[in-house]
């Protein structure tokens, strides 16, 4: 099966079950070891059996066992940085990224030219 058909097939299943289609894309990129651009260039290529087998194992963890994609692939992006994650740590939330961004915008207004200490309390592992 071609990458484009395979991806659409699994994204449709995820969507029907109320899951994010973008998560399916992330899992395919992870197992195929491709960037988004590389995958786009290979959309008409046949998917390798080993990639599809590993991908389907990951998709089942996501759709059937409700395991977050970040735990399956072992990393999460936060404020432009990739962090290793597993069951022992919390996955960074988009709302926390917004908080960091807001604080950085306010920094110059209140603390320009001053050294400050920042304490992160109760926001994760």
Language-model segment annotations:
Residues 1-73:
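N-terminal auxiliary segments of SAM/dcSAM-dependent transferases
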Residues 56-125:
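SAM-dependent Rossmann-like transferase core, predominantly class I methyltransferases
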